[in-house]
Design a protein with these regions (language model features):
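N-terminal signal peptide c-region/cleavage motif recognized by signal peptidases
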Residues: 31-33
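Helix-turn-helix repeat elements of alpha-solenoid scaffolds
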Residues: 40-52, 84-93, 126-135, 173-190, ...
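Charge-biased low-complexity segments
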Residues: 65, 118, 144, 160, ...
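Residue register of alpha-helical TPR repeats
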Residues: 69, 111, 150-153, 205, ...
């Protein structure tokens, strides 16, 4: 076998490092050029809005109905440049024009109020942000009534807000946002059940949203426990608290399960619903059971989904898509990205292929790198194992039975400085 020699091997590794460094610098340069062009375009857009506003005010007055849209666009342009104080002033001016022209409780204020809420949140003014959203909510109640189906998107936006704040807070502080989100989800569920037909196109999405929220709450309780009130308590024993947390977690399992069953019912009632669509949401319910340790119920649910696929135009293709290989189970509500402008990092584009064994119960083990040329530090491997060991997978299903299977996934290296 050819032996490169120690000095040649070191030189080869050094050259690879130089090449990687050069490529990284090129990516940085392209990013900076692109960012500079975007910033110039944003500045030009702002100037265009300001000129249009001046012209319109000069011709039609300071409260022309056309001005509010221009102020909304101006505010969004300022926000895209993170010039939040200017954005806030533009949104508030646009809202004032709407109120003067259409009344204090006009629905046309809603996009301005939600934009104000987003901007106040970006400025760190969470109380003012929530106040703006509550104003939008009360205006909708005034116009529609508290249980009208048109309230569902409004409630959903409030849940979004609380979940974004939850992800920014320490667990103990953020729990109050989960409590508020659950109350809102209960209101949403009531409206969906009582006032909206099952064939409502957005119904499955909103019911799934409720399930996702209950997973977040149950997961929070599992990881951090329930907050204990200071002062008088009936019992402070560890066993008592654990029993309480188990009961609470089961409550959220049950409510999430109920919501997913509604997803199934609503999906069946949708126009042009296919067997694959129905099997897909039934499989999601199986995933839910598996996440909460209900393995037998999960298998029965997967089997039902598999039976539904017998009615599909291409049953084997559909089976391969849903059950041909393990799939990581994902429930929850993630933080919405406020700023999509990012600089490339040296680690960002580096990923590795990881092979693992997925058991019949969806548990991952036996991790190793599928590509021999890839490498991870001990700490990176520790983080990898911790990440995938904390996940559950939908198992491979063959002839309606779960099977142990090898699974290969792409895994992004953790950011530098992340500790296990």
């Amino acid at each position: 076998m050819y032996n490169m020699g120690t000095s040649n091997l070191l030189a080869y590794r050094h050259s690879l490092t130089m090449i990687k460094g050069f490529l990284f610098l090129v990516l940085m340069l392209f990013s900076l050029i692109s960012r500079g062009q975007v910033e110039q375009d944003q500045t030009d857009t702002i100037e265009s809005y300001l000129i249009a506003i001046d012209d319109l005010e000069a011709e039609y007055g300071a409260y022309s109905t056309q001005l509010s849209d221009l102020y909304l666009g101006l505010g969004k342009s300022y926000a895209s440049k993170t010039e939040y104080f200017d954005a806030l002033a533009a949104f508030q001016r646009g809202m004032q024009i709407e109120r003067v022209n259409f009344g204090l409780h006009s629905l046309s204020q809603t996009p301005y109020l939600t934009s104000i809420a987003d901007t106040e949140s970006n400025l760190g003014n969470q109380e003012k942000s929530l106040k703006a959203l509550n104003q939008a909510y009360q205006i909708s109640v005034k116009n529609y009534g508290g249980t009208d189906k048109r309230m569902v998107p409004v409630i959903n936006s409030l849940i979004d807000w609380h979940m974004n704040i939850y992800h920014q807070q320490r667990p103990k502080v953020g729990y109050s946002n989960l409590v508020m989100s659950e109350r809102l989800a209960d209101d949403m569920s009531f409206i969906l059940d009582e006032n909206i037909a099952l064939n409502y196109p957005e119904g499955p999405t909103y019911y799934r949203r409720i399930a996702d929220l209950h997973f977040v709450i149950a997961n929070h309780i599992t990881k951090h426990g329930e907050p204990r009130e200071t002062g008088f308590t009936v019992s402070s024993g560890l066993d008592s608290r654990r029993r309480s947390e188990v009961r609470t977690s089961y409550r959220h399992f049950h409510r999430g399960k109920t919501a997913l069953e509604k997803v199934i019912q609503a999906s069946i009632e949708q126009e042009n619903s296919t067997p694959y669509d129905q099997a897909n949401v039934i499989a999601d319910l199986g995933d839910w059971h598996l996440l909460f340790g209900q393995k037998l119920s999960a298998i029965k649910t997967y089997q039902l989904a598999d039976e539904i696929l017998d009615l599909d135009e291409n049953p084997e293709t559909a089976r391969q898509s849903l059950f041909g290989s393990p799939k990581i189970i994902e429930f929850g509500i993630k933080k919405q990205n406020q700023d999509t402008t990012t600089m490339p990092s040296e680690n960002e584009s580096m990923s590795v292929q990881v092979s693992m064994l997925i058991s019949e119960g969806g548990v991952a083990s036996d991790f190793y790198l599928a590509n021999e040329s890839d490498s991870l530090t001990d700490n990176e491997m520790k983080l990898l194992k911790k990440y995938f060991s904390g996940k559950r997978f939908r198992p491979r299903i063959v002839e309606r039975q779960p099977q142990e299977a090898t699974h290969i996934v792409n895994y992004d290296r953790p950011a530098k400085g992340v500790e296990g």
